[in-house]
């Protein structure tokens, strides 16, 4: 009702759960002054996160020739949302939202995402409809540490949109595996140290590293540590020491920095001389 105070959290839930265009406008004007200025900020953020073929002309996504995106860009945005704003992504799986308005009965509205009502474990994301692109849906499920996001558009009916999105997610779960390459903050392997009080030091990655691959091609994934070694002491904990390289079919697909798991102090002068002699004679670090 006119004059009601609505919290930002309720406005967000109104947008996410109930697809409220009025809530979009209210937040846009509250943040940027006008909806037009907010759309400019939206477009700038889209470019920043890699959405190269997207332009926003309004805050709600209603039909406008200057309001456009692509399936790929919506996938990028969905992934960014889930990774960076998990506290808000929780709202996307809520099946309904009730607003206790002032001076009237509470209003309850349901989530329009049809996959939330299917027994497949979907927890988002959003439906859409435009005159040209017809019905669209960005959807997501998570099973066993593995998240799949499917974005589909161009369906003539809501039923087609729902059915094909389920098929796409099911195909991804059935035909692909998630392989864990490295566990965050856990020793991955050891590298050689020169002139240190220990001859080796463990290395780790600062993030969990996974790769998704077709089940039939799992054996073609390989990973190794590349470093310029032996690495001369002293070494400090968290010092970058090399790269973890991930290959598919012997072609590089990703590179990640690896860091020292702990400090390694340099040996004293006498020990350095002995180690140098050993290295010259035996090649022993």
Label for each model-derived stretch:
Residues 1-83:
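Active-site-adjacent loops and short helices of periplasmic peptidoglycan-processing enzymes
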Residues 51-52, 66-68, 72-285:
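Domain-terminus/edge residues, biased toward the C-terminal soluble/receptor-binding domains
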């Amino acid at each position: 009702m006119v004059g009601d105070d609505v919290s930002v959290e309720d406005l967000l839930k109104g947008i996410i759960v109930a697809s409220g265009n009025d809530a979009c406008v209210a937040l846009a004007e509250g943040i940027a002054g006008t909806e037009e200025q907010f759309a400019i900020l939206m477009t700038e953020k889209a470019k920043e996160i890699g959405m190269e073929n997207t332009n926003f002309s309004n805050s709600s996504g209603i039909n406008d020739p200057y309001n456009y995106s692509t399936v790929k860009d919506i996938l990028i945005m969905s992934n960014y949302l889930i990774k960076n704003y998990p506290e808000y992504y929780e709202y996307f799986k809520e099946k309904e939202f009730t607003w206790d308005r002032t001076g009237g009965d509470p209003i309850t509205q349901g989530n329009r995402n049809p996959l939330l009502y299917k027994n497949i474990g979907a927890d988002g994301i959003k439906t859409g409809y435009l005159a040209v692109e017809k019905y669209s849906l960005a959807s997501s499920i998570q099973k066993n540490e593995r998240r799949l996001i499917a974005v589909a558009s161009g369906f003539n009916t809501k039923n087609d949109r729902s059915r094909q999105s389920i098929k796409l997610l099911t195909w991804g779960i059935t035909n692909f595996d998630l392989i864990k390459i490295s566990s965050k903050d856990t020793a991955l392997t050891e590298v050689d140290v020169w002139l240190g009080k220990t001859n080796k030091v463990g290395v780790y990655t600062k993030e969990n590293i996974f790769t998704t691959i077709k089940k039939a091609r799992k054996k073609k994934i390989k990973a190794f540590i590349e470093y310029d070694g032996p690495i001369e002491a002293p070494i400090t904990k968290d010092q970058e020491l090399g790269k973890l390289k991930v290959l598919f079919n012997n072609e590089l697909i990703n590179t990640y920095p690896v860091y020292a798991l702990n400090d390694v102090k340099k040996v004293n002068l006498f020990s350095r001389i002995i180690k140098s002699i050993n290295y010259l004679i035996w090649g022993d670090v």
